[in-house]
UniProtKB/Swiss-Prot annotation:
<dbReference type="InterPro" id="IPR018523">
    <property type="entry name" value="Isocitrate_lyase_ph_CS"/>
</dbReference>
<comment type="pathway">
    <text>Carbohydrate metabolism; glyoxylate cycle; (S)-malate from isocitrate: step 1/2.</text>
</comment>
<feature type="binding site">
    <location>
        <begin position="207"/>
        <end position="208"/>
    </location>
    <ligand>
        <name>substrate</name>
    </ligand>
</feature>
<comment type="function">
    <text>Catalyzes the formation of succinate and glyoxylate from isocitrate, a key step of the glyoxylate cycle, which operates as an anaplerotic route for replenishing the tricarboxylic acid cycle. Required for growth on ethanol or acetate, but dispensable when fermentable carbon sources are available. Also acts on 2-methylisocitrate.</text>
</comment>
<feature type="binding site">
    <location>
        <position position="243"/>
    </location>
    <ligand>
        <name>substrate</name>
    </ligand>
</feature>
<dbReference type="InterPro" id="IPR040442">
    <property type="entry name" value="Pyrv_kinase-like_dom_sf"/>
</dbReference>
<feature type="active site" description="Proton acceptor">
    <location>
        <position position="206"/>
    </location>
</feature>
<keyword id="KW-0816">Tricarboxylic acid cycle</keyword>
<feature type="binding site">
    <location>
        <begin position="97"/>
        <end position="99"/>
    </location>
    <ligand>
        <name>substrate</name>
    </ligand>
</feature>
<dbReference type="InterPro" id="IPR006254">
    <property type="entry name" value="Isocitrate_lyase"/>
</dbReference>
<keyword id="KW-0460">Magnesium</keyword>
<dbReference type="InterPro" id="IPR015813">
    <property type="entry name" value="Pyrv/PenolPyrv_kinase-like_dom"/>
</dbReference>
<keyword id="KW-0330">Glyoxysome</keyword>
<dbReference type="GO" id="GO:0006097">
    <property type="term" value="P:glyoxylate cycle"/>
</dbReference>
<dbReference type="Pfam" id="PF00463">
    <property type="entry name" value="ICL"/>
</dbReference>
<keyword id="KW-0576">Peroxisome</keyword>
<feature type="binding site">
    <location>
        <position position="457"/>
    </location>
    <ligand>
        <name>substrate</name>
    </ligand>
</feature>
Length: 538
């Protein structure tokens, strides 16, 4: 067999291996609009095993079990390795927040609010820092345990430091090739899963800010496909989480996808000029700031802005029809899921008139269409994303159980096996939202609805700020007493391993490596005679 035949045989062997991989139950709900042949053709000759693939498999196993049992894994945004090692004792996953990274860990070191305007390697870099710490502390612990006699080993901690990391991919930081490159970075740096949201990249906002602009459903599906394709090229089981910001969105970039049409807002006043024409005329007349805002406010007040379905319902109600309720039901049933042009034809057939409704007239100065979000809107998008996503997350304004149930029920009516995620956001005022008894059971109640993974995005930031404020305030007044009472004594009482920070940092582990290299003796061992950490021995 010649070189060309060998080359073809290897290619077809790889294709068959990919086809067999895709038959695994892991992919029973996953839709791929490409072939194994196309994926293998994009691979190089050197097969690389990515450690993150083991973590992805581990994460999937956790979430499969959670969904089956109707329980949840819950975690929070981790800032740095110290926090990571403490989380590993109690929580089975780790979250890496784009918000936290934007404010504390940009690769340019320039802090920013959560606008995803930091370089695209920022969050992957944070994942890498945490994953490297996981590997190190796992090695350190294993060395200590395996060199301890069996009869004493049970007294030692046995912490699973290798908790799967789920990270924030924002909107993908650009077009589809940018999404693929970002996905590649995350896989290389150790992420088990990533989430990506359906906002427009240039105007991305924190999920709890105003002014969110969506992309069409089809565009976000393309992003999800790009993530899966890149993971397939790299041979990994990376989890893709689809986030929708449509519950509170007010704008959308395009009307190209008919699945968005029912939620786009139009003007019902035929006597008005398009808003942008008036705004442009105002600018040319020298108006600025509040004067331009007044023009927009007046136009909106007169425009009769509403959804096309609402315009049809209002037309039927205002007409001379005898059976108005029946006609409304007939229209809404027939128009559900249809494009606007199809809905117009249905409406004319029922009402006998061409209803004036113009979605171009209210467009913003940036060209965006006005949009009316909400829970049903989010369900509409989630149902479309489900075949391409392992989990789905609806960003919401409040921790509202009834809304969470409405969303879960709406998605599961179409996709019963769809796993869901939930942001237990610190942007919510939890004290106002529900009593403490309900706070305590909220995660469990959501888990029963299928929210298999839940997370507090910024708990790492807030807990760090809280203890830093408490300690700095007390330290300024009480000096070292504050350190003893607020930090060291509680560390010792609660058995926090960082109290012996030299050992926590791996000094014993490194000493033993040096001794291995030098025949068992090292006069420069960091933990030798004279180390101050001996003060903490019992």
């Amino acid at each position: 067999m010649g070189f060309l035949e060998d080359e073809d045989q290897k290619y077809w062997d790889d294709v068959q291996a990919v086809k067999a991989w895709w038959k695994d139950s892991r992919w029973r709900y996953t839709k791929r609009p490409y072939t194994a042949e196309q994926i293998v053709a994009k691979r190089g000759n050197l097969k690389i095993h990515y450690p993150s693939n083991d973590q992805s498999k581990k994460l999937w196993k956790i979430l499969e079990s959670n969904f089956e049992k109707k329980v949840a894994s819950f975690t929070y945004g981790c800032l740095e390795p110290t926090m990571l090692t403490q989380m590993a004792k109690y929580l089975d996953t780790v979250y890496v927040s784009g918000w936290q990274s934007s404010s504390t860990a940009s690769s340019t070191d320039e802090p920013s609010p959560d606008l995803a305007d930091y370089p695209m390697n920022t969050v992957p870099n944070k994942v890498n820092q945490l994953f490297m710490a996981q590997l190190f502390h796992d090695r350190k612990q294993r060395e200590e345990r395996i060199t301890t006699p069996k009869d004493q080993r049970s007294k030692l901690p046995n912490i699973d430091y290798l908790r799967p990391i789920i990270a924030d991919a924002d909107t993908g930081h650009g077009g589809l090739t940018a999404v693929m490159k970002l996905t590649k970075l995350f896989i290389e740096r150790g992420a088990a899963g990533i989430h990506i949201e359906d906002q427009a990249p240039g105007t991305k906002k924190c999920g709890h800010m105003a002014g969110k602009v969506l992309v069409p459903i089809s565009e976000h599906i393309n992003r999800l496909v790009a993530i899966r394709a890149q993971a397939d090229i790299m041979g990994t089981d990376l989890l893709a989480i689809a986030r929708t910001d449509s519950e509170a969105a007010t704008l959308i970039t395009s009307t190209i996808d008919h699945r968005d049409h029912a939620f786009i807002v139009g003007s019902t006043n035929p006597n008005l000029q398009p808003l942008n024409d008036l705004m442009l005329a105002g600018e040319q007349a020298g108006k600025t700031g509040e004067e331009l805002q007044a023009i927009e406010d007046q136009w909106i007040a007169q425009a009769g802005l509403k959804l096309f379905d609402d315009a049809v319902v209002d037309t039927i109600k205002a007409g001379v029809h005898v059976n108005k309720d029946a006609l409304i039901k007939e229209y809404l049933t027939a128009a559900k899921g249809k494009s606007n042009s199809e809905a117009r034809a249905i409406a004319k057939g029922i009402t006998g008139v061409d209803i004036y409704w113009d979605w171009d007239a209210p467009r913003t100065r940036e060209g965006y269409y006005r949009y009316q979000g909400g829970t049903q809107c989010a369900i509409n998008r989630a149902v479309a994303y489900a075949p391409f996503a392992d989990l789905i997350w609806m960003e919401s304004k409040l921790p509202d159980y009834a809304q969470a149930k409405e969303f879960a029920d709406g998605v599961h009516a179409v996709w019963p096996e769809q796993k869901l995620a939930y942001n237990l956001s610190p942007s919510f005022n939890w004290k106002k939202a529900m009593p403490r008894e309900e706070q305590e059971t909220y995660i469990k109640r959501l888990g029963a609805l299928g929210y298999a993974w839940q997370f507090i995005t910024l708990a790492g930031l807030h807990t760090t700020a809280l203890i830093s404020d408490q300690f700095a305030r007390a330290y300024a007044k009480q000096g070292m007493r504050a350190y003893g009472e607020l930090v060291q004594e509680p560390e010792m009482e609660q058995g926090v391993d960082v109290v012996t920070h030299q050992k926590w940092s791996g000094a014993n582990y490194v000493d033993n490596m040096l001794k291995m290299l030098t025949g068992g003796v090292s006069s420069t061992a960091a933990m030798g005679k004279g180390v101050t950490e001996d003060q903490f021995k019992h």
